[in-house]
C-alpha cells in the first residue's frame, strides 16, 4: 500500500504496520527527493533514513499538520532538531498518519483547533451571525504546546498567543484546489473554539482561564466608539471574547500610505491577523469556549452558501496557531554550496530531504529573526498563494539537509611537561641562589637546550626537606586549639 521506505531494509516494514509508514519526501513542486520510514511514537514523529541518523520532531514542537489525498505534511517549530520548516511526505496512507497523529495529540492533552466559528465585528459576544459549524475531522489539525496551568492533562485546553499569521495562509503541502482549506468571510473575523473532551474538562474550564497575552488589558472602557483600536476582553457565561488591535506592521503601512491619520494609542503587543486596507473595517478576532455539544456536531461543514459569506469562496481563513515556548534560532540549515559535497559523499543526493516551502526567505525578509514567524511573510509581499515558488526564494537552499552525523573525534591536544633537572644538583652546587627573586644563572650556560624548552625548575632537595619538615610536625589529636600563631613550632 505505502510508497515509502525503511531505514535499514525497505521490505522490513509491512504495508499495514500500525505505527510505521513508508513515505517519500517531496519538495514544493512535487519532485521526489528521498524515501524513509515515518514512525509515530507516544511523544514524537521519527523519520528513519537510510544510512543516516533518525530525525525526530516532538509533538509539542509541531505547529500544524494535515493531509490531502496521498500527501501528509506538517510545520515544525524552531525548537525542533531541524529548526523551523514545513515538510511534505507522499504516502498512500496519509490519512492514517493524520488520524493516528491526531489521536496521539489528544491523548497527550495537546490542543488541536478544529472548529472555526465565525463572529462578525459588530456582533454581540452572545449573538452569532453564522451557525457554529465545526470543521470535519479530516480537515487540518493545529497543535499548540500550551496548557492553562502549565501541566498537560489539567485544566481546559486553551490556546496561548504565539505570532501573527496571514489571511492567505493555508496548508503548505496542499495544492490550490485543496478541499481542506478553510474559507473566511469578507470581514476576516475569526473565532477559535476550544472544545473540552468531556464534561469534567468543561467544568474545570469555568474556573480556569488562560492568561491574557502581554499587552492586552482586560475590561477596557468602551467609550471610544465603534472605531476603537485597543484590545478588549469580554467575559460571558460559557465564552470569552478577545478583541485585538492592529498589528505594528499594519499601523506602519497605514501611516506610510496616509490611509489612517491617527490611531488611538495602539498596543505594542498584539496577535491579531492581517488588517484590511481600510481603517474603519478593522477586523476583530473572537475566541470562544464552547461546550462539548459542538464537538458532537463535527459533521457540519462551512459552505460558501451560508449567509454572510457573499460568495467569496476563494478567501482563505487566517489560521492563528499559537505556542508559548520562547523562539530559538533555526539550526541544521544547509547551504546550497554544501549540497554538492554531500552528494559526492553519499552517492545519492536525493537522500537529503527538503521541507515543502520551509521558508527561510533570507533575501526577502527585512525583519529580525525573533520577529519572523514563518515563511508566509514572503507570500504576502508577492501576493501569491502558499507555498512560495523556489524561483522567488533566491537566498534559501533548495534542499534541506537531514544528514545529522555524529561529531568526529577531537584532534589530539598538546601536552606540556615540566622538565626536572636530576643532574648537576649535587653538593658542589653553590648555595647562593636561595633568594627566589634572583635568577639561577648557571642553568642557561650549562644546559642551554633544556632551559629553552622548559618553563619551570624544581628544586628536589628543597622539596624533600620541606616534606620531611611537615612529617616531623606533631600530630593533632583534636584536643589542641590550633591557630596560625601557635602551630609553627619546629621539631628540635
From Swiss-Prot:
The UniProt entry, under Pfam families, shows:
IRS (PF02174)
One example of the protein's molecular function in GO is: transmembrane receptor protein tyrosine kinase adaptor activity
Is the Membrane keyword given for this protein?
yes
Traced from the root, the source organism's taxonomic lineage reads: Eukaryota, Metazoa, Chordata, Craniata, Vertebrata
Q: Does the keyword Nucleotide-binding apply?
A: no
- Cross-referenced InterPro entries, in alphabetical order? Docking_Protein_DOK, FRS2_PTB, IRS_PTB, PH-like_dom_sf
For the region Disordered, give the residue spans: 153-173, 338-455, 467-492
Give GO BP annotations, semicolon-separated: fibroblast growth factor receptor signaling pathway; signal transduction
Q: Source organism's superkingdom?
A: Eukaryota
Looking at the record, the residues that make up the IRS-type PTB domain are 13-115
- Lipid tethering residues (N-myristoyl glycine): 2
The subcellular location is: Membrane
| Post-translational modification comment from the UniProt entry | Phosphorylated by ULK2 in vitro. Phosphorylated on tyrosine residues upon stimulation by BFGF or NGFB.
Protein's job:
Adapter protein that links FGF and NGF receptors to downstream signaling pathways. Involved in the activation of MAP kinases. Down-regulates ERK2 signaling by interfering with the phosphorylation and nuclear translocation of ERK2.
Q: Which GO terms describe its cellular component?
A: cytoplasm; plasma membrane
Do you know which Gene3D superfamilies this protein is assigned to?
Answer: Pleckstrin-homology domain (PH domain)/Phosphotyrosine-binding domain (PTB)
Subcellular location, principal? membrane
List the protein's name: Fibroblast growth factor receptor substrate 3
Keywords for this entry?
Lipoprotein, Membrane, Myristate, Phosphoprotein
How does the UniProt record describe the way this protein sits in the membrane? Lipid-anchor
Assembly: Binds NTRK1. Binds FGFR1, NGFR, GRB2, PTPN11 and ERK2.
Amino acid at each position: 500500500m505505502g510508497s515509502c521506505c525503511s531505514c535499514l531494509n525497505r521490505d522490513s516494514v509491512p504495508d499495514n504496520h500500525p505505527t510505521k509508514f513508508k513515505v517519500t519526501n517531496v519538495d514544493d513542486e512535487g519532485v521526489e527527493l528521498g524515501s524513509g520510514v515515518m514512525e509515530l511514537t507516544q511523544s514524537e514523529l521519527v523519520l528513519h533514513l537510510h544510512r543516516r541518523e533518525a530525525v525526530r520532531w516532538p509533538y509539542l514542537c509541531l505547529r500544524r499538520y494535515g493531509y490531502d489525498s496521498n500527501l501528509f505534511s506538517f510545520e515544525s517549530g524552531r525548537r525542533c532538531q531541524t529548526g523551523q520548516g514545513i515538510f511534505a511526505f507522499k504516502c498512500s496512507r496519509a490519512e492514517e498518519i493524520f488520524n493516528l497523529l491526531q489521536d496521539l495529540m489528544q491523548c497527550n492533552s495537546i490542543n488541536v483547533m478544529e472548529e472555526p466559528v465565525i463572529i462578525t465585528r459588530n456582533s454581540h459576544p452572545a449573538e452569532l451571525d453564522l451557525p457554529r459549524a465545526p470543521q470535519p475531522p479530516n480537515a487540518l489539525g493545529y497543535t499548540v504546546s500550551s496548557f492553562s496551568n502549565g501541566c498537560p492533562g489539567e485544566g481546559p485546553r486553551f490556546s496561548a498567543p504565539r505570532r501573527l499569521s496571514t489571511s492567505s495562509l493555508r496548508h503548505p503541502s496542499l495544492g490550490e484546489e485543496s478541499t481542506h482549506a478553510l474559507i473566511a468571510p469578507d470581514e476576516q473575523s475569526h473565532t477559535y473554539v476550544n472544545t473540552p473532551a468531556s464534561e469534567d474538562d468543561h467544568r474545570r474550564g469555568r474556573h480556569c482561564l488562560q492568561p491574557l497575552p502581554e499587552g492586552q488589558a482586560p475590561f477596557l472602557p468602551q467609550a471610544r466608539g465603534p472605531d476603537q483600536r485597543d484590545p478588549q476582553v469580554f467575559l460571558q457565561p460559557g465564552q470569552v471574547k478577545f478583541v485585538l488591535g492592529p498589528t505594528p506592521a499594519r499601523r506602519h503601512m497605514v501611516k506610510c500610505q496616509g490611509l489612517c491619520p491617527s490611531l488611538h494609542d495602539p498596543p505594542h503587543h498584539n496577535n491579531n491577523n492581517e488588517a484590511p486596507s481600510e481603517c474603519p473595517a478593522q477586523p476583530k478576532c473572537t475566541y470562544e469556549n464552547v461546550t462539548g455539544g459542538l464537538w458532537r456536531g463535527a459533521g457540519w461543514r462551512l459552505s460558501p452558501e451560508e449567509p454572510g459569506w457573499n460568495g467569496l469562496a476563494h478567501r482563505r481563513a487566517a489560521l492563528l496557531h499559537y505556542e508559548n515556548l520562547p523562539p530559538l534560532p533555526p539550526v541544521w540549515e544547509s547551504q546550497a554550496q554544501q549540497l554538492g559535497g554531500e552528494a559526492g559523499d553519499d552517492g545519492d543526493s536525493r537522500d537529503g530531504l527538503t521541507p515543502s516551502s520551509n521558508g527561510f526567505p533570507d533575501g526577502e525578509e527585512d525583519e529580525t529573526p525573533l520577529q519572523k514567524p514563518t515563511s508566509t511573510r514572503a507570500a504576502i509581499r508577492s501576493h501569491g498563494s502558499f507555498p512560495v515558488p523556489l524561483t522567488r526564494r533566491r537566498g534559501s537552499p533548495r534542499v534541506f539537509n537531514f544528514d545529522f552525523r555524529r561529531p568526529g573525534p577531537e584532534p589530539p591536544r598538546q601536552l606540556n611537561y615540566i622538565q626536572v633537572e636530576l643532574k648537576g644538583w649535587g653538593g658542589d652546587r653553590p648555595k647562593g641562589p636561595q633568594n627566589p627573586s634572583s635568577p639561577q644563572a648557571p642553568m642557561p650556560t650549562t644546559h642551554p637546550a633544556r632551559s629553552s624548552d622548559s618553563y619551570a625548575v624544581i628544586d628536589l632537595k628543597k622539596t624533600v626537606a620541606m616534606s620531611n619538615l611537615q612529617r616531623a610536625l606533631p600530630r593533632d589529636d583534636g584536643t589542641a586549639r590550633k591557630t596560625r600563631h601557635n602551630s609553627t613550632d619546629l621539631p628540635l
